[in-house]
């Protein structure tokens, strides 16, 4: 059975994994992939997927380069800020020394493909691309990147039309990319609702990712096909699952695996996140 994990203590214990050349380590790898990423790590490649990604910066800032509605844009995610990247947005994370960030994504459906692209200079013309079924991005990216650096396209800076798809396997997103938000400031602005026991959504209901903030109160749930990740931001709570009571105190996290019935009691002063990513709720990329 899953046990609570204190996030900052876990990060400290695994700090060596956030340095080059690895730069990341998974906390959970089930239906939800909960990972922490460090640096320095600067990249030229852009990743594209049919699911969404949640970013939160624990230590220091990062830069996320995106292709938004046909134009390049730099999104700075500062320490303490949270951000939701829509599905189908080409993105290239740039991370710096002495930084650590949380990234949450989900297991791919068997029908979904990921893409890795390089563009010609600062244009939106595709120089090189590979589409693949993603099982472990950490091990699958390196061979593709090496293939690019050994390619004629890399040497000449010119694409080979015969190796580019006329159309990608799925349409790129036409949604605008949101601005990152300071989580602490958001909490301060919604304390009355949270104290009244009203769960609040950070990003609304137009995404498959549901990042909910819970104040005091109780709830129970059973998500048959998706994991639920809980993170205690303030105060304490108690989760009951599989006949056991698990106490969560400040900075504790807990993964509730898919198909697990759980109850959640949150006392006065409790503030906690719950995160799910349900592909059954996928939105149109248009």
From Swiss-Prot:
Q: Which GO terms describe its molecular function?
A: 3-hydroxyanthranilate 3,4-dioxygenase activity; ferrous iron binding
Q: Where does Fe cation bind?
A: 47, 53, 91
Catalysed reaction per UniProt? Answer: 3-hydroxyanthranilate + O2 = (2Z,4Z)-2-amino-3-carboxymuconate 6-semialdehyde
Q: Per the record's keyword annotation, is Iron included, yes or no? A: yes
Tell me the CDD domains matching this sequence: cupin_HAO
| Region of interest (Domain B), residue spans | 178-286
Q: Which UniProt keywords apply?
A: Cytoplasm, Dioxygenase, Iron, Metal-binding, Oxidoreductase, Pyridine nucleotide biosynthesis
Region annotated Domain A (catalytic) sits at 1-160
Residues that, per the record, bind substrate: 53, 95, 105
Record-annotated residues binding O2?
43
Q: What does this protein do?
A: Catalyzes the oxidative ring opening of 3-hydroxyanthranilate to 2-amino-3-carboxymuconate semialdehyde, which spontaneously cyclizes to quinolinate.
* Subunit annotation: Monomer.
The name this protein carries in UniProt is: 3-hydroxyanthranilate 3,4-dioxygenase
Supply the gene name: HAAO
């Amino acid at each position: 059975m899953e046990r609570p994990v204190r996030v900052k203590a876990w990060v400290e214990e695994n700090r060596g994994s956030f340095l080059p050349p690895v730069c990341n380590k998974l906390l959970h790898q089930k239906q939800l992939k909960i990972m922490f990423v460090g640096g320095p790590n600067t990249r030229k490649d852009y990743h594209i997927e049919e699911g969404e990604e949640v970013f939160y910066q624990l230590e220091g800032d990062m830069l996320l380069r995106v292709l938004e509605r046909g134009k390049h844009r730099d999104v700075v995610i500062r320490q303490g800020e949270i951000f939701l990247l829509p599905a189908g947005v080409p993105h290239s994370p740039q991370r710096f020394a002495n930084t650590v960030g949380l990234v949450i994504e989900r297991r791919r459906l068997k029908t979904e493909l990921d893409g890795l692209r390089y563009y010609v200079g600062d244009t939106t013309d595709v120089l090189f691309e590979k589409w693949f079924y993603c099982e472990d991005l950490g091990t699958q990216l390196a061979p593709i990147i090496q293939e690019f650096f050994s390619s004629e396209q890399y040497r000449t800076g010119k694409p080979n039309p015969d190796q580019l798809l006329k159309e990608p396997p799925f349409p790129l997103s036409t949604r605008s990319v949101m601005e990152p938000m300071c989580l602490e400031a958001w909490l301060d602005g919604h304390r009355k609702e949270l104290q009244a026991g009203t769960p609040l959504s950070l990003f609304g209901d137009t995404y498959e990712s549901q990042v909910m903030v819970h104040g005091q109160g109780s709830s129970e749930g059973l998500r048959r096909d998706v994991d639920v990740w809980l993170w205690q931001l303030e105060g304490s709570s108690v989760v009951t699952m599989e006949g056991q009571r698990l106490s969560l105190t400040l900075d504790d996290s807990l993964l509730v695996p898919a198909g697990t019935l759980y109850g959640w009691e949150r006392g006065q002063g409790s503030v906690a996140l719950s995160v799910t990513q349900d592909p059954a709720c996928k939105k149109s990329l248009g």
